[in-house]
Amino acid sequence: AITYRSRPIFYSLQMPWENDWLNGPATEAACARILSLIGVQATAIRATEGGCCGWSVVVAIKKRAGEGKNAISALLSLPVVKQVIVTDDDIDIGNPDEVEWAVTFRCQADKDVVVLSGLKGKHVDPSVRPWDLKPGELPTTAKFGIDATIPEGIPAFRYERIVPAFADSVAPRDYL
């Protein structure tokens, strides 16, 4: 039978991918486990929504020398993780502005960005161009990590965030 509606709703969005939200805790648990195995003390781990709760991870650590990049290497070894940002534990990784601030002011791209090429990829990642692969061919990808921790040998106070006086008591909407 052919049916129709007099006032149909055309659903043109992609499905909500409930599995992405369900993957978040599992990804965070896998990250916690691998960091524990290499002796890095994570204080917070977040699989971000923008990275479909698995492809992109932000981690705050209690850092010792070399641990920022060690954490990046370990986390990028996880099959689905493609992008990692590691910060010190003074950064609220649930606040994208604080994470961006840490990347902007605690990172030098030539020293603190790690790029690994030729790693195993996933067919669902359009950046690996799965449509160009031959049947049975596995995709490879590049993954990267950003070490947004305070560099070793520099006092932490040099990297403290400066908050303008009275910033909490002023509401911009009062002046618009």
Model-derived features with residue positions:
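Charged, compositionally biased interaction regions
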Residues: 1-176
